Every structure is written in structure tokens, then in C-alpha cells.
Amino acid sequence: MSAFTIIIPARYGSSRLPGKPLLDIAGKPMIAHVYDRARESLAKRIYVATDDARIAEAVEGFGGSVLMTRADHPSGTDRLAECADTLELDDDEIVVNVQGDEPMLPAELISQVANNLAANPQAGIATLCERIHDRETLFNPNAVKVVKNEAGMALYFSRAPIPWARDYFADADAGLPPTYDFYRHIGIYAYRVGFLRDYVTWGSCPLEGIESLEQLRAMWRGVPIHVDVAAKAPPAGVDTEADLQRVRAVMAKSS
């Protein structure tokens, strides 16, 4: 297994769930569950990156490590780059970005994405996907789709249904073409530190702006992104109050 560092960006502000990292799930703040999943991955080091003292206090309260960051980062990737500099990581080291609202993320996926990046030295980023089985998901703009080549490198990410089955999709009542597998992107990333340092020097690109997908900035610059099918289906994260109640119910049964 390759050595890697996990950084969990955590913000207190959320338009739909204020204070989301500190919301209680089965007697612990959400961020504690995310940290537990990170520990199960056997990462070399784990940090929560935040600009909020309340989150830092909670993390230190359960024995976690915290990196305090600036509050003006436009994205989680920019926050990771600051952390890499704070930790003085070498350019060839691997950092995995684990979202702070994924309390049930299987640890196997964290290790999978880190190992995939280590095994593909030509890539600057590695990420995961899962097969789409229904037309509703394929046409849902909140589900990001990805197309990859035979070597497992991303060709494009989009909120639109890609690739477009020209003849098949003319029938609005049809399901999915049986001759092609469509994939939904799973938002877990492993980065080479050198890429992170380059990323923050690049301005936003037109594709990133129109799709609102920051990984397109890397593609615009020609950075190869390795995409693998997730070894295990990941449960949905927590974006809404309904998500929170669903996760609470599931974790209450398992505790």
C-alpha cells in the first residue's frame, strides 16, 4: 500500500445545514465519523483543515489533528494546497481529499484512490466513479457524469448526460442503451502535491465556470485524471436535512 496523507476540509458555513461538521450523529459530531473512516484507511497522516475555531476544538476533543487555514479559499483544492505547504510535503507525495460530509464513506475507497494514483505516475489526480443504472440519474444535473478512455483516463466530466446516445435518447420513454456503460463521478480525489501547487497558480477556465466543476480546470491544462470504478458502492453524503436524518437512522442501527 502506498503512503499517503488525508486532509479533510471542513467549513462551518453551509447554506442548507449551518455548522454541518458538528451536527450530532449517533452521539458524535459528523466530523468525528469522517475522521474514523479516514483512520480505517491506514493513511500515514490525517488532518482536518478548517478556518473555524469551533471545528478545531471539536476535532482536538476527540484526539484528531487540525490545520488552521485561511478563510478566503475559493475551493477545497486551494485549501489543500495551503495545507501541503504548511506540512512542507514533497511534490511527489500523495494527498487524499476526503469530504467532511461523508460520515459513511467506505475506507476501502480512500485507499483505492491513493493506490491508483501511485500506480499511474503519469496522472496528477485520481478519482472514482460508479455505473449508472437508470435514466433519471443520467439526466440529473446534480449527478456528475464522466467519460474515460480505455486506459482509465478521464476524457470529460459533465452535468449533462454523456456520451449522448443519438438514436436511443430520441425516445423519452426508453431506458439506457444496453451496449454502453454510463458512469457517475464520485467526488473523492487523490492528488500529487506538485499538482496542487500548480493548480492554485492557474486561473479558472471557461469549462470550469460553465459546468461549475473544478476538476475541469485540470483537464483544461492537460493534467491526466485517472478514473476507476469504485470497489464498493459509497452511500450518499450529507447535503440536506433529509440526508442527515437518513444517515442518523442508518448509524443508529449499527451503533
Swiss-Prot record:
- Compartments, as annotated in UniProt: Cytoplasm
* Pathway note: Nucleotide-sugar biosynthesis; CMP-3-deoxy-D-manno-octulosonate biosynthesis; CMP-3-deoxy-D-manno-octulosonate from 3-deoxy-D-manno-octulosonate and CTP: step 1/1; Bacterial outer membrane biogenesis; lipopolysaccharide biosynthesis
Instruction: Give any GO molecular function from the UniProt entry.
Output: 3-deoxy-manno-octulosonate cytidylyltransferase activity
Q: Name one GO cellular component term.
A: cytosol
Q: Where is the major localization of this protein?
A: cytoplasm
User: GO biological process annotations for this chain's record?
Assistant: CMP-keto-3-deoxy-D-manno-octulosonic acid biosynthetic process; lipopolysaccharide biosynthetic process
This protein's species is Hahella chejuensis (strain KCTC 2396)
EC assignment: 2.7.7.38
UniProt-listed Pfam families? CTP_transf_3
* The family this protein is said to belong to: Belongs to the KdsB family.
Keyword tags: Cytoplasm, Lipopolysaccharide biosynthesis, Nucleotidyltransferase, Transferase
The name of this protein is 3-deoxy-manno-octulosonate cytidylyltransferase
